[in-house]
Design a protein with these regions (language model features):
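Glycine/tyrosine- and acidic-biased, solvent-exposed loop/turn segments at the edges of beta-strands
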Residues: 15-142
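Sec-dependent N-terminal signal peptides
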Residues: 3-13
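Basic side chains
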Residues: 2-3, 41
Length: 142
């Protein structure tokens, strides 16, 4: 019976994480970072605005020290400012943007959509007026 109990908890111990928080001089939270047992970022990392209300400035996901998955940044009033996805490079050395990234005006309307290919290069760029109409591209592209 003791062996069964130990085996049930072993997977949880292998995935143990440590959460580190840093604070502004004012005492408000600055960041919350999850680390795996090897000391590498693993999980959601959040940075906060400095007025003490736990208002998130940015949040990104990490796996084994590398940014991967969803990234979001927010305005001071909590609206999404930018959002997109990161992926590992083939060599696994660094992370790069992939898919569609969106940026928003402070008022919440869509500002730009940038599409990145599998190599992290921007292949499509659309810019919007606040009323949603597409802005014409400047001569020569972006």
């Amino acid at each position: 019976m003791k062996k069964i109990i130990i085996l049930l908890f072993f997977p949880l111990l292998c995935q143990a994480q440590e959460v580190k928080r840093a604070y502004y001089n004012s005492g408000a939270i600055l960041s919350e970072v999850h680390y795996n047992i090897e000391g590498k970022r693993d999980g959601t990392t959040k940075y906060f605005y400095d007025w003490g209300a736990w208002a998130i400035k940015t949040e990104a996901n990490y796996k084994n020290g590398k940014m991967i998955g969803t990234f979001k940044s927010y305005t001071k009033d909590g609206r999404i400012k930018e959002e997109g996805f990161y992926k590992y490079t083939e060599a696994g050395v660094y992370s790069e943007r992939t898919g569609i990234w969106k940026r928003y005006y402070d008022s919440g309307e869509l500002n730009t959509e940038i599409t990145y290919d599998e190599n992290g290069r921007s292949v499509k760029y659309i810019s919007y007026e606040k009323d949603g109409t597409i802005m014409p591209m400047p001569e020569g592209g972006c």
